[in-house]
Each structure stands twice: as structure tokens, then as C-alpha cells.
């Protein structure tokens, strides 16, 4: 079940994910998938253009990895790879994309409009070569790759992100380490999923809770900052997508958490 393939772009789609989590947590584990070889890149598919950033990729990954269920990571997801920029239908290999292009043309669309219509959801977006370096063919091969290399490979690649402690790649490593840690692996594997703050339109948030711990996962998908009131003072900040690692919590009265656009936090309460 490609849970996250249902989308996070609006309240209705987020509610679909929540309903599925609540329904299935008593029976087993869902497969939580943002992208695979038959779908476009998750950052490009599920996030608005203002969120096509390292922060957006980290935010999406936080939800994917910490929902109840089995998270699957597809090659390139861990560095935030995005859909390619396609200039011609001849650049595609996928027969379905070519078929959709011809259907669009027969329906009266121009070459440019037909290309735009079919390229956004083309599975070839997830089949471009893995971006290892900023060198020739993104370091994937010295030969001729089966598809063109995404033009953003000089900015998004493993080599650059290995050297950046705040990169998407190193954030995913921290995220996975928390999920697999002796202290939290039972919680994130078997813990209950409890949605919260569903009246705040831009925020998707939930608790993962077991008999001894309660952890809040909250993400702001909106373009502007948003705030929520915490049920208790934080016991521990486990992770934040902010480069400085800080979390904005006002503790002058009831603790209030403020999330910037595309910010996600993991907080033990």
C-alpha cells in the first residue's frame, strides 16, 4: 500500500493518510512509500514549488520515516532528488509517457502543453541516473546513460552532501538512527499513531506513543510560520530540520511551538 502516494498537498489528502493509519494500526503495518521506480520524485510530486528545497525534502522524509508502518526509501530520495526538466518527448524511454503525450496531442494540446502534462507524472523522473558527484554524468558512468542526467546534479549529489553536516543525506541518517535506536525502536515500530492539531490547516502532526514514551512529530507544509500549543513541556528535542537544530518554543505560559515554512520537528513530551 503506497500510503504517501495518496499525497500531502491538501487537508483532504492528509486526512486520507490519517484515516488509513488509524484503521490499519490494529491489524499490521503499512508500507510507507514516497517514491519508487514507477512514480515521479516525491519532492516534485507532493510539495509545492516553494518547498522544492532541502528543508522540504527533510520535512517529507520525517513524515515518511516516522509514520507507523514500514518506511521504504528509493535511491536518490535520501539526497532529495527531483523530477528532471524534459525538453522533448524523444528524451523519454517510458512507453506510457509517450502514449500519454500522443493522447494529449490528439486532444488538441500543443507540443509544449502535451509535454508538460505528461512529464510531471512520468516514471522516468525516478529512473534518471543516481547523482553521485558533480562530475561527468553525475559520476554514474563514463559511458552513455540510458536516460539523461538531471540537470541539477551539480547542486544535488551524494559527494556534496557527504561533506555538509546539514544536508538532506545526513538528516536522513539521523532520522533513521533515531528510529532504529535502542531507546526508541519499540516506540516507532509498535507505538500507537495519534493524530493531533488537525484543525491547523498547514500542519500535519501526530504522536507516536507506547506505555512509556510519547513523541510528537510535527511538520508545517504551509508557506508561512504556524504555531500550536503543546500538551506539556518538552522533555527532549530529538530532531529538527532547522540547520541550527533549534526549536522555537515559547514557554512563558502554555508551551507554544512555532514552525517555519517547511520545518519539521521530533519532540519527546
Residue spans of the language-model regions?
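Single conserved hydrophobic/aromatic residue that forms the stacking wall/gate
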Residues: 1-12
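Active-site clefts of carbohydrate-active enzymes
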Residues: 29-51
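Beta-strand-rich binding/interaction modules
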Residues: 225-243
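C-terminal beta-strand-rich structural cap/linker in extracellular carbohydrate-active enzymes
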Residues: 250-269
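Solvent-exposed beta-strand/loop surfaces of large extracellular or lumenal domains
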Residues: 238-254
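Glycoside hydrolase catalytic-domain groove-lining segments
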Residues: 10-27
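Loop/helix patches that line or flank the sugar-binding groove of alpha-linked glycan CAZymes
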Residues: 17, 51-215, 221-226
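Residues immediately flanking
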Residues: 36, 221, 269
